[in-house]
From Swiss-Prot:
SUPFAM superfamilies tied to this protein: 5'-nucleotidase (syn. UDP-sugar hydrolase), C-terminal domain (SSF55816), Metallo-dependent phosphatases (SSF56300)
InterPro entries per record: 5'-Nucleotdase_C, 5'-Nucleotdase_C_sf, 5'-Nucleotdase_CS, 5_nucleotidase/apyrase, Calcineurin-like_PHP_ApaH, CpdB_N, Cyc_nuc_PDE_nucleotidase, Metallo-depent_PP-like
Lineage: Bacteria, Pseudomonadati, Pseudomonadota, Gammaproteobacteria, Enterobacterales
Enzyme Commission no: 3.1.3.6, 3.1.4.16
Function: This bifunctional enzyme catalyzes two consecutive reactions during ribonucleic acid degradation. Converts a 2',3'-cyclic nucleotide to a 3'-nucleotide and then the 3'-nucleotide to the corresponding nucleoside and phosphate.
Encoding gene per record: cpdB
Gene3D superfamilies: 3.60.21.10, 5'-Nucleotidase, C-terminal domain (3.90.780.10)
Residues that coordinate or bind a divalent metal cation 2: D76, N116, H225, H257
Leader sequence residues: 1-19
GO cellular component: outer membrane-bounded periplasmic space
Sample GO molecular function, one term: 3'-nucleotidase activity
Organism, as annotated: Salmonella typhimurium (strain LT2 / SGSC1412 / ATCC 700720)
Protein name: 2',3'-cyclic-nucleotide 2'-phosphodiesterase/3'-nucleotidase
Note: Two kinetically distinguishable active sites for the two substrates (2',3'-cyclic nucleotides and 3'-nucleotides) have been identified.
Length: 647
């Protein structure tokens, strides 16, 4: 007993002598989407609102504030802007370094994680791109089909030299682990099927985090390309961060994917979220928006009084590069990065400036959420023409009527960017304009759907709208921004229909039925006659929608054929062909859908948000199908319009 006490005392004395406190800052970029420059290639103009060359200034400043810091990237890096398109079209030869890594390699990243869009161009292209990174990558939940082992390094434990508060050198063993949404197997099935599988994020964390601790990790940093949702836990969830915060042994969560900002007011209602501290169930967590518009910062205080390092204090914040309220830049350009990127930037501008045709009219998406719209119409026209030509030699498919589904991709972001609208001017069109009209490198896929499934597909799309109370004279918001993503608001061309927003939504934002008795889709017709529920249609869409199985009429069993061509390339080719045939395209909407008139004895005050600009105001005045009046500008900068749906 005396021997034991002496040993214990010696241990305590040693721990006391070696006790130290370390401040550690962890910084994060995420969802850069190849926006390296502070430049909007779609508008061919500089911007202060996004771009890594400005985020870099925040990185330098944040580093200079502290003794100890590390920087991580959370994926969706190589795709998403014309720079990414240019590089994918050009290809990567042995030894080529992708421009995103020319930039990131100068900023001393400790580690990177993969996002879902890393797989858009296939595994070979991804591996060639990653070869240019001078920092390691982690991902724990992608499994190689052949080896049944992780395709990438699941986690890393990096010995990191730090300085404690007394000025003494210390060594921290920082563990990093990365995750990607399992849905990549749906979204990029053509690139991944038969090559990899993907495991559940939370279950994978529960497997590896204890192992990381056993192998000596002093702290564990989770880098999750996944969003935050308080929905009940279910396996293979896309947005798993809430449940990652409950995994024992996790010290910090750097997350993304949702293009939102945490800590932020949009997440104030989530149980366990402390917006002031930037914690989730007590764990510091940060999600720094998109395109480099924020830098994520987690600050930890670590102490080893007990003989092992423990987090004693923690906080997180997302630092913006632009003050939207004051309309003021908060970050200057990093001139070194600008110089490094100049050649690729210039080549990208040249790439997107190649003429493809002409347009007889302007194409703006200011009203795309409230009425049929030219920016969606031209996509549907192109997809429909492509499929009708493609099936001519197939006797089984050629007899089926062709519809086309497309959604507005640029209608204010996630109600976080009043400048994010399609603005294509009449006259000469370039590839830049095609990329503005169709943002993503999706491929065209055709599904077979019954008339009943077409209606249910549209019922899910109609979840884009809030229900209007016909007895209330208070202001009512028309657009369901919080519960529905605008890229899921499919307009199906080839049929005619109305959407009755006085009725409750039949489906939620995930196309799960919530009101079985509700019906918003009215007067659904094909060639002037009610759609036969048992009729079969071909519906042109994209690989995300077709393989997703979320909407009625989609999923593997419904695939009629998968095109090798990108929807955007189909659009560009159609613009070229139509311009050659007719001299120019005529992008007017055919008005195959509209919001059904609402009859009420109450003077309704229905409102929607759109661009605040004079160009938008003029367009709305000239093209609005319903009486509309601008009544305010909200705190984000969106114009608020009152719309009369009584007619």
């Amino acid at each position: 007993m005396i021997k034991f006490s002496a040993t214990l005392l010696a241990t305590l004395i040693a721990a006391s002598v070696n006790a130290a406190t370390v401040d550690l800052r962890i910084m994060e970029t995420t969802d850069l989407h190849s926006n390296m420059m502070d430049f909007d290639y779609y508008k061919d103009t500089a911007t202060e609102k996004f771009g890594l060359v400005r985020t870099a200034s925040l990185i330098h400043a944040a580093r200079n504030e502290v003794k100890n810091s590390v920087l991580v990237d959370n994926g969706d890096l190589i795709q998403g802007s014309p720079l990414g398109d240019y590089m994918a079209a050009k290809g990567l030869k042995d030894g080529d370094v992708h421009p995103v890594y020319k930039a990131l390699n100068t900023l001393d990243y400790a580690v990177g994680n993969l996002g879902n869009h890393e797989f858009n161009y296939g595994l070979d292209y991804l591996h060639n791109a990653l070869a240019g990174a001078k920092f390691p990558y982690v991902n724990a939940n992608i499994i190689d089909v052949k080896t049944q082992k992780p395709l990438f390094t699941p986690y890393l434990i990096k010995e990191t030299s730090v300085i404690d508060k007394d000025g003494n050198p210390q060594t921290l063993k920082i563990g990093y682990i990365g995750f990607v949404p399992p849905q990549i197997m749906i979204w990029d099935k053509a690139n991944l099927s038969g090559k990899v599988t993907v495991n559940d994020i939370t279950e994978t964390a529960r497997k590896y985090v204890p192992e990381m601790r056993e192998k000596g990790a002093d702290i564990v940093v989770v880098i999750a390309h996944s969003g935050l949702s308080a929905d009940p836990y279910h396996s293979m969830a896309e947005n798993s961060v809430y449940y990652l915060s409950e995994v024992p042994g996790v010290d910090a969560i750097m997350f993304g994917h949702a293009h939102a900002v945490f800590p932020g007011k949009d997440f104030a209602d989530i149980k366990g979220a402390d917006i002031a501290k930037g914690t989730l169930n007590g764990i510091p967590a940060v999600m720094p928006g998109m395109w480099g518009d924020h830098l994520g910062v987690v600050d930890l205080v670590l102490n080893n009084d007990s003989g092992k390092w423990q987090v004693t204090q923690a906080k997180a914040e997302a630092r913006p590069i632009y003050d939207a309220a004051a309309k003021k830049s908060l970050a200057a350009e990093d001139s070194k990065l600008v110089g490094i990127l100049k050649a690729d930037h210039d080549a990208t501008r040249e790439f997107v400036s190649k003429p493809i045709g002409k347009s007889a009219d302007n194409m703006y998406s200011y009203l795309a959420l409230v009425q049929d719209d030219p920016t969606v119409q031209v996509v549907n026209n192109a997809q429909k023409a492509y499929v009708e030509h493609f099936i001519q030699g197939d006797p089984d498919l050629a007899k089926l009527p062709v519809l086309s589904a497309a959604a507005p991709f640029k209608v204010g972001g996630r109600k976080n960017d009043p400048a994010s609208f399609v603005e294509v001017e009449k006259g000469q069109l370039t590839f830049r304009n095609a990329a503005d009209l169709y943002l993503y490198p999706n491929t065209l896929v055709v599904v077979k759907a019954s008339g009943k499934e077409v209606k249910e597909w549209l019922e899910c799309s109609a979840g884009q709208f809030n229900q209007i109370d016909i007895h209330s004279n208070k202001p009512q918001s028309l657009i369901n921004w919080d519960g529905f993503r605008t890229y899921n608001f499919d307009v199906i061309d080839g049929v005619n229909y109305q959407i009755d927003v006085s009725q409750p939504a039949r489906y939620d934002g995930e196309c799960q039925m919530v009101n079985p008795q509700a019906e918003r889709i009215k007067n659904l017709t094909f060639n002037g006659k009610p759609v036969d529920p048992n009729a079969t249609f071909l519906v042109a869409t994209n690989n995300y929608r077709a393989y997703g199985g979320k909407f009625a009429g989609t999923g593997d069993s419904h695939i009629a054929f998968a095109s090798p061509d990108e929807n955007r390339a189909v659009l560009a080719a159609w613009i070229g062909a139509e311009s050659k045939r007719a001299g120019e395209i005529h992008p007017a909407a055919d008005n195959n859908w509209r919001l059904a008139p609402i009859h009420s004895d109450t003077a309704l005050d229905i409102r929607f948000e759109t661009s605040p600009g004079d160009k938008a105001a003029a367009f709305i005045k000239a093209k609005g199908q319903y009486p509309m009046k601008k009544v305010a500008v909200d705190d984000i900068g969106f114009a608020i319009y009152q719309v009369d749906l009584s007619k």
